[in-house]
Every structure is written in C-alpha cells, then in structure tokens.
Amino acid sequence: MLSKKNNLKHFIQSSGFCGPASLKIALSYFNKEFSEKKLTKLTKANRQFGTEHEGMIKAIKKINGYVFAKENSTINDLEYFIKKENLPVIVGWFDNDGDHYSVVSDINLKNIILADPACNQPKREIKRKIFPKIWFDFVGNKNQKVSWGWLMVIYFEKGKKFKIKGKYY
C-alpha cells in the first residue's frame, strides 16, 4: 500500500478525459496540484480519441517530472512499484465503455485496487486474476493499435533507476 502520509486525492474526470484525470490523481501523491484543464492541454487529449501514452509522458516531462513506462507488464511489475518503490502506477486498461486510464494504489492477494477517475468512490477493486485479461488499451492513429499491459510511473528524482526493464523519459 502507498504511504499514508501521501494519500492519493480522488478526482472525478470530465467525460473522455481519464488520462489527464489519472495524471491529476497520481500527481497528488507528490503534493503537486494541476487542473484537469491544464493537464488536458499538456497531454493534447481530446474527447473523441482520449489521451495517447505519448501525451501522458510528454505532459509529465513539461512539468519537470520523469516517467518510467513499459508495455507487456505483469502483476509482479505492479507489485514492485506499489510495494517496493511505494509509487502509484497509471495503467491503460479496458473498461465496459472502452479503453481507460486509472491509478493502481494497492494490490493484495485477491484484488488490484484502483483510484478510478470514472468512479464516485475513491477505490475500485478488480479481481487479480481478471485484471491481466482487461489490461489493454488502444493507441495510435484513430486508436488502431492494441497496447497490452501498459504502465506508467511518475517520479521526480533525476537519475532514478528501477529493477524492472522499461523505458525512461
């Protein structure tokens, strides 16, 4: 579970803007406040196609943050960041309405616990055995490419390295 001193602040997204809203939630962990409108502009999100992974990464770079991102991630990768690094993890996954971003805040033996900007309550639980089946989203021109197991971790410590292979931005 993430540190109690730095709880995530839940935020309800505007329609189509789960990416900027998830960034807002994750940034609250670091006591960094940005409006959804500002993050929408930085990510270049739009209601029709949402937010590209690339836009999420560029937005964090523009506010002097760093990003670790990875495709084809595993539940063990999520556990590493939540339990060992004590960092929230943004994931792209497939909800009932389509592809969606949320912030993983905890993991236990049964569930993945999300701070989901589409939900009124601050925690949403998805069965651990179900999550890998829905952990995909659509990216690229007109959302024509499937991205499996994408995750993104924000941090503000220059030069930080993790024990998982992925891309640093």
Model-derived segments and spans:
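Active-site-adjacent structural segments surrounding the nucleophilic cysteine of cysteine proteases
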Residues: 1-49, 95, 108-110, 156-169
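Helix-adjacent hinge/juxtasegments
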Residues: 58-82
